[in-house]
Amino acid sequence: MSASLRLSDLPQCFQGVVPSIIATADAAGIPNVTYLSQVYYVDERHVALSCQFFNKTRRNLDDNPRACVEIYDPMTLQSYRLRLKFLRSEKSGALFDAMSARIDAIASVTGMKGVFKLIAADVFEVQRLEKVEGFLAAGLPDAEADRPSLGGHRTEVRGLQWVSERINRAPDLESLLVAALEALEEYFQFAYTSVLLYDEQADRLITLASRGYGETGIGAEVAIGDGVIGTAARDRQVLRFSTLDADLGYARAIRRHASSEHTCEDIPRPGLTDAKSALVIPLTVGRRLVGVLAAEDRDPMRFSEWHEAYLQIVGNQIALGIDRMLDRSAADLDADAPPSTPRVSPPRSSRKKLTLTYYKNDEAIFVDGVYLIRNIPARILWKLLEESKRTGRTEFTNREVRLDTALGLPPVKDNFESRLILLRHRLQEKCPDLQIVSTGRGRFSLQTCADIEMIER
């Protein structure tokens, strides 16, 4: 290997923006050249290649362990050649899991689950690394010089401190999520981000906050193991893509449409249909999944190794903050707080009329025939409406709602605050005449400026 050139100097070559090429030969010396799905940096002396099919390349390596791989810098289009010696195939372990998660995510989005999968991670010794001289015409601009500088270690530490403080000072869960995404945009210039929290009871991720996509998408669900986000959550693996092509954009844009008037349609998840890069960080406390932090961009080179490492630190802060908020909301529900100013209702003659229908079998609520919300948040809203209709009450506490066994909340880590955030956002978006307003820690009111007809089916 060249003494002046190291694999760690070429991180952009391992992002897969420009497909790499491998050349092998069989025992008789007959060559075979093909494209590679993944070239994975292991360390200064080793790389791993994805083995997805028992093809000619695989058979050649069994006969002859020597291979040559060309990788490309997507910014300069400079080519580098790796002379390799095959060492072993790994079918389990950390390396296999990291490479497999990336392939599984693409397979899930493109409908290729069970077909497009990793068979093994083939580990090679890099015996020589060389720059392919004369590959490009002289005089091309230096792309490295044009890359923005982040100001060195002092700026990095100061930025991390700033983001951490924003998260730590948040008074409640919703403020924490908003502050985290705002800080990521202000410091990192991450313009398109979202946070999804894990609902253990439903085994799904629920979108609770987003930035850059407008006001829609809160409440959108992702099944564990589904797509890039669901795969990152299932495997507890960070996923970074620089090659999100048209297939991913097309798959994300497809929505299941309601087949009848009262079918609970999916809420479209916030996302760019033309995203070229993505970085997905599972939010965990130990090995326990709390949620997922997702960022994407139209620039295929937006996210680097540096961003991945740095965002993992930020993700740990967010995960601990979420966990702290959920613990606190379970233990400290009825702290005294000044009441909010009540909303003044308009005269009865001018009030709107709303029809809310609760479908018990689907556990879903519709407003004037339009889907609003389902599952536990729907049960919570229906309980509040029934209680308000029966007693005239509009003020409630988290504690009393949580203690209602009919709601089916889990006894530990019930995510009540996150469910209330989701319900509040869905009402703001779909039913602004009916609102849930915080009146202090552990307290809220049900406010309406419409006459509500309740129908249960």
Where are these regions (language model features)?
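Helix-loop-beta substructure at the N-terminus of cytosolic sensory domains
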Residues: 170-208, 325
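Regulatory sensory and allosteric helical modules in signal-transduction proteins
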Residues: 208, 215-271
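DNA-binding patch around the recognition helix
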Residues: 332, 372, 387-389, 409, ...
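Signal-transmission linkers at sensory-effector interfaces
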Residues: 138-174
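A short, aliphatic-rich beta-strand micro-motif
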Residues: 266-268, 276-284
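Short amphipathic alpha-helical recognition elements used for nucleic-acid or partner binding
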Residues: 370-404, 423
